[in-house]
């Protein structure tokens, strides 16, 4: 065992003394040492219930014959950090988390890891660490929140309803009482945000990849099932250590293709493009950005999930969960091993019934194509991402007049002041991985567009990214980004921009001579943040089309 390096032999007498100083009995020294990387914090609804899950994981580890050690990992809530300086830190924490898990596991020669996670960047950070370390690992996602409840049984979604309510109140569509009812009822308790936003999409994809136990991706945070899954995960990690089942034997090209197909079938968050690219990078799996679009054209959308649709995570779980989606996708899914021991196809075959009102069959899809599309053109030579499942038919093709803003705040002010009109195309730039830095989510302006009733007449493009709660004609991840001199930096107010999602094009309708003249005049702006972690991050982070991973060069 790896842990023998810190507990066996004469030379390790000081190491054993330190371990005994923590309370480890001599009788436990021959057992596998299992680290539990926990992202508990009482700052985030998605993580506030983890203390309970920690207990069940620990019980499972000891039942399985291992010895558990806990260590902490930071958790940032994208909702709380949204719309201000805090959002600069969200995506970079993914890299910090991967580095921290790696550091603790390697420094203490842990035999295996249980990765307790839930929210947006924490789950991919944990998976990146698992792929990088390639020691036995199992992921426990803490589970989604129940939908909120309002008057007359109305269901509330935190992300969609609260952010859009701000603009609706500003526009006079709702009054202060309705706003307060939404605020008070949108989050009824612990768990990740209720729809198919980034956290829940990543939990589902973690199960699809084979890195968590069946039902883990959809079992509600408040459920007894989630606790049983936590216990079983603790027990299972000891078996994985004894049999040396490591993440890279599970995270194959087939696993990533399966995850992309499930994402497309459910209409998941566009952030998953960044995260799957980054996890594949750590696993040594070649996964070009174009793969998402190739699979989207042959994988129909099978579910209508909130925010663009009517169903919540509780509905998906009851309808069959991940296994139900795999079953409905049929021969589009490739067989692959999982941490459970059963293969992906065995998991799909394990479910008896699927509620086809929620998870449609291939013969009756919600939409003919998957939920995400990759666009290219002279405005995005290396690609851009759109969650096409959230775009109305009226906006699948659009030509608009550019309104340029060099920050999210400037665009948000223009929206809330009523300065954006039908036919405009909002351009938010210098918000990419380097330029932001941190590639902030543009949920506030996209929610304002919808709340102001502009979702069928105004589009938005950015080198930043979007929340899983974003819906509407919003194109992100434009690469190269403005801070690297990408074409989005050359757009001027009044330019015409063509968006054609069916044809996968994003074009700036300006002649090449004019663009060459603008390019010659362009100068990179001063960094927005010059000190601290983010200043270092901006120097080494790569482009969105590579997953915004940090360069080792």
Curated annotation (Swiss-Prot):
GO terms for biological process: isoleucine biosynthetic process; L-valine biosynthetic process. Binds 1 [2Fe-2S] cluster per subunit. This cluster acts as a Lewis acid cofactor. Its EC number is 4.2.1.9. Its cofactor is [2Fe-2S] cluster; Mg(2+). The keyword Amino-acid biosynthesis applies. InterPro entries: Dihydro-acid_dehy_C, DihydroxyA_deHydtase, DiOHA_6PGluconate_deHydtase_CS, ILV_EDD_C, ILV_EDD_N, IlvD/EDD_N. [2Fe-2S] cluster binds at residues 119, 193. Keywords: 2Fe-2S, Amino-acid biosynthesis, Branched-chain amino acid biosynthesis, Iron, Iron-sulfur, Lyase, Magnesium, Metal-binding. Homodimer. Belongs to the IlvD/Edd family. This is Dihydroxy-acid dehydratase. It comes from Geotalea uraniireducens (strain Rf4). The gene is ilvD.
């Amino acid at each position: 065992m790896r842990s023998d390096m810190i507990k066996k032999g004469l030379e390790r007498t000081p190491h054993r003394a330190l371990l005994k100083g923590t309370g480890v009995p001599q009788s436990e020294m021959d057992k596998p040492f299992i680290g539990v990387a926990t992202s508990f914090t009482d700052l985030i609804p998605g993580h506030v219930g983890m203390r309970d899950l920690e207990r069940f994981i620990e019980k499972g580890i000891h039942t399985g014959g291992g010895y558990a050690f806990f260590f902490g990992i930071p958790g940032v809530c994208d909702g709380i950090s949204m719309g201000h300086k805090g959002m600069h830190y969200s995506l970079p924490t993914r890299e910090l988390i991967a580095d921290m898990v790696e550091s603790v596991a390697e420094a203490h020669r842990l035999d295996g890891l249980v990765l307790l996670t839930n929210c947006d960047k924490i789950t991919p950070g944990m998976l990146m660490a698992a792929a990088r370390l390639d020691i036995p690992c199992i992921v426990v996602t803490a589970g989604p929140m129940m939908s909120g409840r309002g008057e007359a049984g109305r269901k509330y979604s935190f992300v969609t309803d609260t952010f859009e309510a701000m603009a609706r109140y500003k526009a006079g569509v709702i009054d202060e009482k309705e706003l307060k009812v939404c605020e008070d009822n949108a989050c009824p308790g612990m768990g990740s945000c209720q729809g198919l936003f980034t956290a829940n999409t990543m939990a589902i994809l973690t199960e699809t990849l084979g890195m968590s136990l069946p039902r883990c991706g959809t079992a509600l945070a408040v459920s007894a099932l989630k606790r049983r899954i936590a216990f079983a995960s603790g027990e299972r990690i000891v078996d994985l250590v004894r049999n040396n089942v490591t993440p890279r034997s599970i995270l194959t090209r087939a696993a990533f293709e399966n995850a992309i197909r499930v994402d497309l079938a459910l209409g998941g968050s566009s952030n998953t493009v960044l995260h799957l690219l980054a996890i594949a990078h750590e696993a040594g799996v070649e996964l070009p950005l174009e793969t998402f679009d190739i699979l989207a054209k042959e994988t129909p959308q099978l579910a209508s999930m909130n925010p663009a649709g009517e169903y919540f995570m509780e509905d998906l779980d009851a309808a069959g969960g991940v296994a139900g989606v795999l079953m409905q996708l049929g021969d589009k899914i490739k067989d692959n091993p999982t941490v459970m021991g059963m293969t992906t196809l065995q998991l799909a075959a394990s479910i008896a019934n699927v509620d086809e009102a929620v998870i449609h069959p291939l013969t009756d899809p919600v939409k003919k194509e998957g939920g995400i599309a990759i666009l290219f053109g002279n405005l995005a030579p290396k690609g851009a991402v759109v969650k096409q499942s959230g775009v109305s038919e009226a906006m699948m093709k659009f030509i608009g007049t550019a309104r340029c803003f060099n920050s999210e705040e400037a665009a948000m002010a223009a929206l809330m002041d009523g300065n954006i009109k039908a036919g405009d195309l909002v351009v938010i730039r210098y918000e990419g991985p380097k330029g932001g830095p941190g590639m902030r989510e543009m949920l506030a302006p996209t929610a304002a567009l919808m709340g102001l009733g502009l979702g069928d007449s105004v589009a938005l493009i950015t080198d930043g990214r979007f929340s899983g709660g974003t819906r509407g004609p919003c194109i992100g991840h434009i690469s190269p980004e403005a801070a690297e001199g990408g074409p989005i930096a050359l757009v001027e107010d009044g330019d015409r921009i063509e968006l054609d999602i069916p044809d996968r094009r994003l074009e700036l309708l300006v002649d090449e001579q004019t663009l060459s003249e603008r390019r010659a005049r362009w100068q990179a702006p001063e960094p927005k943040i010059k000190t601290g972690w983010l200043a270092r991050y901006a120097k080494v982070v790569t482009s969105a089309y590579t997953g915004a991973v940090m360069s080792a060069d």
